[in-house]
Amino acid sequence: MDNMLTFARQQQRRNVRWLLSLSLLVLLATLLSLCAGEQWIAPGDWLSSRGELFVWQIRLPRTLAVLLVGASLALSGAVMQALFENPLAEPGLLGVSNGAGVGLIAAVLLGQGQLPGWSLGLCAIAGALTITLILLRFARRHLSTSRLLLAGVALGIICSALMTWAIYFSTSFDLRQLMYWMMGGFGGVDWQQSWLMTALIPVLIWICCQSQPMNILALGETPARQLGLPLWLWRNLLVVATGWMVGVSVAMAGAIGFIGLVIPHILRLCGLTDHRVLLPGCALAGAIALLLADVVARLALASAELPIGVVTATLGAPIFIWLLLKSAR
């Protein structure tokens, strides 16, 4: 008994150290994001006229958006992996991000460019929810993890094809701009998108507080039922929350892959398996990863800005291949 108590205390201290370290790294990454750009602006110059323009009006809203979207995507990946009992589940791989893109493009086509910005965000959320609900239907049919993964990939390909057809045959300038936007990027984010940032915060906080049902869900469907968890209720709540986070993220920054897949895996490999630590850890680590990727996207080329989706795919694809090989052993 004493050994168990000692182990529990050591594990608790270790978890606290992890969360404190990740919180510190978030602060450092945020500081770097605010300073870095075509012009390096040190914190001492933030209150100058130059700092007023570049830091407070341009970089701060972008940094906040990157932070929230990174946290949302990583949390969505962790939730989907528990929800579908599939370690390879993530919004981009299972087509949820592409579903949000289809919803957005449908709104642009049907609205003839006359719809307000908030309605486009809601259409992206609806598209993400639709794909997530379809995937949940497949999961309830007790498909194997490989079949469920293939179903998600197929849905993603269908959504991608629909977007490509719509963009290719469109004469709308707005729709052609969406082709570049769907590669992922925060270049157009300013304080006008603050309502989208605000829409993410309560869902992020709520998800981070649901460690107990998430731990039970991770045990599997049968143990969860035996422990008295109302599976139908929690599945639908988590589907809505995940679809909301992915839809808002896509509406704000386009499709950004691999954050939701790689971050939860890395934290689990580091020993953070309890969702009481894994969920806030994913939010913090996802924010760090996307903040650093955004800095790379801004600074890699002197004359242009790389799509952040390209940066995350370039860094995430090798890790994804390694995870596939590791899971096949």
UniProtKB/Swiss-Prot annotation:
Any Gene Ontology biological process: cobalamin transport
Membrane topology, from the record: Multi-pass membrane protein
Keyword Transport set for record: yes
Gene Ontology terms, MF aspect: vitamin transmembrane transporter activity
Annotated localization: Cell inner membrane
Family per similarity comment: Belongs to the binding-protein-dependent transport system permease family. FecCD subfamily.
HAMAP family linked: BtuC
Name under which the protein is recorded: Vitamin B12 import system permease protein BtuC
Gene source species: Salmonella arizonae (strain ATCC BAA-731 / CDC346-86 / RSK2980)
Origin organism lineage: Bacteria, Pseudomonadati, Pseudomonadota, Gammaproteobacteria, Enterobacterales
